[in-house]
A protein has these predicted regions:
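Polar-ligand-bearing catalytic/cofactor-coordination segments
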Residues: 1, 10-333, 347-461
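Short, contiguous hydrophobic alpha-helices characteristic of membrane insertion segments
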Residues: 337-346
């Protein structure tokens, strides 16, 4: 595991170094201006330099944070911090239900990691983001969010971990039925967590107001219906209390979807641009990207569970990481610990798959862009993406190797070039059809009016 962590750190540092060298930034800015005239006003020299400084600072902070986090993980897993916390919990509460004791000890380890990362989160918010005009959060809100996050962990993760520990205790033996039950439990927990996050957790941190009736709401409802979906709700989130960033997302299970718009998005983008952004999100559902990601998650979970069942029943795994108090008699109660160790071992090597997973994700993003261009038009989509890129101080010209390894979304120039390849006759076809239908309807009404006038009765019904 240490070798995997060391190798991933070396590769990440090398890619970050390559990215800081630059890769024809100003040449690419010039190409953006040729693709669309709006780019010349959005990506001024001052704005581009600010984005570069922001991204450089973000990378430096992330590398330092990752180094400290890796050190904490090593301390927790290799040098006995996690076993010491577990031993302390069971020593302090000798009659505690084993599954609950494991859940509490895992929460305490997680809490320690949260506290280690807290200074970096503070620096990111009140130094990096603040200096570049991205932060809207007060220190009081930061403290409240941190406390809420810890309380949510206690309320949700501890019972969930205890339930997982119980399932593994009862079904964690190396049998086909045990494997099927564990896999089914973990797969089913995904949609459950999504529902809890949507209806409970997110509402603890943000306010969601229904989008006011008007032309934008009608356009969003229409584009959903055209694609066989229904907007269960269209809401505006008060993201501007915390950040100047803009975005939107669509989520939900089945044909009923919930559209969430950041309040800053409504301020900075036109209605047609917002429709284009939502069309992109609808494209992910329509093109079965969400289904693919769920199946991908199931496949990864299946492999993880298979490895975990094999390892978590091996006493030597626990002893290797300092859990000397685990014995053949009490091992079933500690299988959740073994499961966590197995996942950590997998994580130290699965980073090798990052380029492949990133490539698949970027490909799906381009497909969703093409879908949105056909639904809402190429021009609104291009201008909306450029505005999002400029507002969020996103990197304009990352190093190709850095982008291949780390970027789940294409950088702005490849996205705009791909959108340009959408045939003009397909661009905004639904918008054109709607305009054509309106014109046709108007001509029919005028013809009917002329016929009625010709009756001589003087009435227009």
């Amino acid at each position: 595991m240490l070798l995997g962590v060391f190798a991933s750190s070396i590769v990440s540092s090398w890619l970050g170094w390559r990215n800081t060298l630059g890769s024809g930034l100003w040449k690419k800015v010039g190409i953006l201006g040729e693709i669309h005239p709006v780019a010349k006003t959005l990506f001024t020299r001052k704005k581009v330099q600010e984005a570069e400084r922001y991204q450089s600072g973000s990378r430096n902070l992330e590398e330092f944070s990752s180094t400290v986090t890796s050190g904490f993980d090593t301390l927790a897993l290799v040098f006995g911090l996690a076993p010491a916390i577990t031993w302390a919990v069971f020593t302090a509460f000798p009659s505690i239900w084993p599954c609950l004791g494991i859940a509490i000890s895992m929460f305490l380890v997680s809490l320690a990691g949260t506290l280690v990362n807290l200074p970096f989160s503070y620096l990111e918010t009140f130094s990096l983001e603040e200096n570049h005009g991205m932060n809207r959060m007060t220190r009081g809100l930061f403290a409240t969010d941190t406390l809420k996050g810890i309380l949510v962990q206690i309320a949700l993760s501890v019972p969930f971990s205890a339930a997982c520990a119980y399932v593994l205790q009862r079904c964690g033996d190396m049998t086909v039925s045990g494997y099927a039950i564990i896999l089914g439990a973990f797969v089913a927990s995904g949609p459950v967590w999504e529902i809890i996050d949507t209806h409970v957790v997110s509402r603890l941190f943000n306010k969601f107001e229904p989008l006011r009736k008007g032309s934008l709401k009608k356009k969003l409802d229409a584009i959903m219906r055209r694609n066989g979906m229904e907007a269960s709700s269209i809401v505006v989130m008060d993201s501007g209390r915390r950040s100047a960033r803009t975005n939107a997302y669509v989520h939900g299970i089945g044909r009923r979807k919930r559209i969430v718009l950041f309040d800053e998005l409504l301020k900075n983008l036109s209605e047609d641009e917002i429709v284009a952004i939502v069309a992109h999100e609808i494209g992910h559902a329509k093109l079965h990207h969400i289904l693919f990601e769920r199946l991908q998650s199931v496949a990864m979970t299946a492999m993880t569970v298979a490895l975990a069942i094999w390892l978590m029943n091996d006493l030597s795994l626990y002893h290797a990481f300092g859990y000397r108090f685990v014995t053949p008699e009490n091992l079933p109660s500690f299988r959740l610990v073994g499961f966590g160790l197995s996942v950590a071992l997998m994580g130290s090597v699965t980073w090798i798959l990052s380029p492949l997973m990133s490539w698949i994700s970027r490909k799906m993003e381009k497909q969703a862009d093409a879908f949105a261009a056909k639904e809402a038009g190429k021009d609104p989509l291009r201008t909306s993406l450029m505005k999002l890129n400029a507002d969020n101080l996103s990197e304009l010209a990352p190093d190709p190797m850095y982008e291949a390894w780390n970027y789940s979304h294409p950088s702005i120039l490849p996205r705009l070039e791909a959108i340009g390849e959408v045939p003009e006759e397909d661009s905004g076809r639904w918008a054109r059809r709607k305009t054509s239908e309106k014109k046709s309807s108007g001509r029919k009404r005028r013809r009917r009016g002329r016929r009625r006038k010709g009756t001589g009765n003087g009435k227009i019904v």
